[in-house]
Amino acid sequence: MASKERQTILLACTECKNKNYYYARGKKKEFKLELNKFCKACGKSTKHKEGKAN
């Protein structure tokens, strides 16, 4: 099944630590995901780093 090879992660703002986005990616990736996304709390585009979703 393809769903077993994907995991859900959280993207959290690096400035205010607000958890804004959920993202699904493959389990075989060894690097931490880091994207520029819009943060509603900050009101601007900031870097969002990967964290674990419960």
UniProtKB/Swiss-Prot annotation:
GO terms for molecular function: structural constituent of ribosome. It comes from the Bacteria. GO terms for biological process: translation. GO terms for cellular component: cytoplasm; ribonucleoprotein complex; ribosome. InterPro entries: Ribosomal_bL33, Ribosomal_bL33_sf, Ribosomal_zn-bd. Pfam families: Ribosomal_L33. The keyword Ribosomal protein applies. NCBIfam families: PRK00504.1, rpmG_bact. Belongs to the bacterial ribosomal protein bL33 family. This is Large ribosomal subunit protein bL33. The gene is rpmG.
